[in-house]
Amino acid sequence: MTRVYLERAGNRFTVSCQGHATGNQDVCAAASCLIYTLAGWLRNSSVAVEKEHLDQDANAKLIFSGGENAETAFDMICTGFLQLELTSPQYISVILNVI
């Protein structure tokens, strides 16, 4: 199962993704697509990136902060992961924490 943790603490945002969606390559590919798209966007934006960790073992963590652009990027990635969980809850678990 893929486990996703999303956190908004003021203007600081955390996106963490761990594990493979064993048994469903489509969910695994979709989760990877979402996290790598966000990482690419962050690299090309003016948003402050505190941490970027992406590895080949299905683990990723992005921590970033900023204003409206960072918030919009976070909202978009949350929507993507929550929609994925809605369609495939047996393969992906998403926790959204707003502090």
Tell me the role of every PLM-derived stretch.
Residues 1-27, 35-99:
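N-terminal intrinsically disordered, cationic/polar leader segments
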